[in-house]
Amino acid sequence: VVGLWEKVKAQEKNHAPDKKASALDGVPMHCPALIQAEKLQKKAAKLGFDWSRQEEIVDKIQEELNELREAMKSGDDARIDEELGDLLFAASNLSRFRKRRSGELLLGTANRKFKTRFMFMEKELAAQGKKFEDCNIGELEALWQKAKGK
C-alpha cells in the first residue's frame, strides 16, 4: 500500500499543471541549508553556470561582503539579513568548487576549533579567579589570541 501511495504521489507531482520542471528540482529542502546550497550550486554547475577559477569565487565573496557592509550602514535589517545570506551562499560555493570537503564538514571543523579555544579561555580565566563577565573585550581578545597560539 505504501509503495502504491508513493507511486500515485509521484505521478501527481509530475503531472501537476502548475508544476514547472527545473534543473534544481530534486534538491531536498529538509536537509541543512549549507548542504542545500552546495547541491543547488552543483546542479547549476553541471549546466555550465559555474566559475572557472576559485579566485573568482573569492572575488564574489568579497563583493557580497562589501554589499553586507553597505547594508549595515543603512541599518535595514531585512537587507542585512539578505546580504548575510548571500555571503554564506557564496562562501559555500567555494567549498563546493574546491571538491575537497563539504562546507558542512568544514564548518563542523571550525565549530570544534572555536569550542576548543573558548574552553581554553574559560580555563585561563578560572585559573585567574575570573569569569568572562569580569573582563573587557580587550582582555578577552588577548586571551583569544593566546588560545589561537595553542
Regions found by a protein language model. Name each.
Residues 1-84, 89-150:
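Flexible "arm" and connector segments at domain edges
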